[in-house]
């Protein structure tokens, strides 16, 4: 036990802190940029000739992330706050068994879980650094997905330790599966989408959100099904996002498109701008 504690202590002592990032000089105090990243499936292996889509592995996903993030950030305004929502299924697998934890569906993986987790943390660190260069403060939330019910926690805790000395970054460690944030008269929500239909999500939020009645502009993100859809449900604007990842062998049986985007919200008027990159190579 003492040897294990010693190894853990050495690992945390070697965890480098986030380096300082220059504060942007001119930001809009009434704006909040939201980057919803759903279904990244980091560590997935896909062969385009088999799937009818593009190839996918860790190296290609890294290039896609760097290129896509740069494109949407170039369009979005500099804002008081940015929110990076990792909306579940950040990693394709949860362990080295290469199966979905609940249904035991076999997964095509590109690497062992140690490398997948390490490289996933590194690319999210890159994303946080880029977002912080343009926005005054950044909030990070890592949500559970059906592919990563445990590994998402390791990534969240790693990001919290990395940003501990950075006052402009907050890692939201709320253990609930629902993300909720108020921005003036605007409310933003997120949930992976595998355990609740959109109508039920709207009813649930109206019941439990403490600032629901204060915000006439309400927006919710989900993912999971890898197919874009949007609907006005009661007082909620619900959107199921297109995935970051392309199709794998299983997903090739239906049509989906990839995308990465930033939504800009005004604290009084709700969503005012959307920047989308289709992640085409």
Label every model-predicted segment.
Residues 20-40, 48-171:
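Core catalytic region of metal-dependent phosphoesterases/phosphodiesterases
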Residues 14-23, 68, 200-211:
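Short, motif-level signal for alpha-helix interfacial/capping segments enriched in acidic residues
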Residues 132, 158-177, 182-281:
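Conserved beta-sheet core of the metallophosphoesterase superfamily
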Residues 44-47, 249:
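A generic structural signal for short coil/turn motifs at secondary-structure boundaries
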Residues 12, 109-110, 266:
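Short, structured coil/loop segments at alpha-helix boundaries
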Residues 1-28, 64:
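Long, contiguous juxta-domain segments that are non-catalytic but functionally important
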